[in-house]
Amino acid sequence: MGVLKQWLPYVLSGISAGGQYALIAVGYTMVYGILRLINFAHGDIFMVAGLIMVYLSATMPLYAALPAVVILTVALGFAVERCAYKPLRQAPRMSVMISAIGVSYLLQNLAYYVTGGVPKQYPELPWISDTITILGASTKRVTVITPVLTLVLVVALVILIKRTKVGMAMRAASKDFETAQLMGIKINNVISFTFAVGSFLAAIGSMMSVSYTHLTLPTKLE
């Protein structure tokens, strides 16, 4: 029992971290599945979501800040796609990659400018950040919530992709981009929606991750 009490918090923390990275990975792979291009700015969107929460929580109640962070993060992902990717839809792949890297550096430097490169204290989220006891071992509730929430979101995403029209359009675009476009699928809307979903997952992952550390850094997720 003593060994379990000693090691259980580390096991739960590892599972929780795995859930956080899973949310980020799903966002990466969704974009890659359609564009066949890694969205280098995705980790920066994760970082920006944390900083948005820091500044919004200082100006409004947490119950209002939480949905606002998600909405603003989704809007950021949508804007990145519209500004950095859509104009280069017919451009060589290298041009799109350079644009993606440029957006990544832009968000990083903007974060450094706003924060001065100083880590910011993340607000403590009620209930989520509370300490609980499991089998005699103390851990934060977020370590238990994260893998469960990740599983729920992944199942919801599978249902979205398999059972809805937009999901069918996403699958068609990932199989054959040009043929899907010829069949009447609005590729631009599908891609923008994919970026929005990926950014939503990044926002949730950011909340879960930084709720555990209570510290957000003006640098991208590596």
Where are these regions (language model features)?
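Helix-loop-helix "hairpin" substructures at the membrane interface of multi-pass membrane proteins
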Residues: 17, 138-212
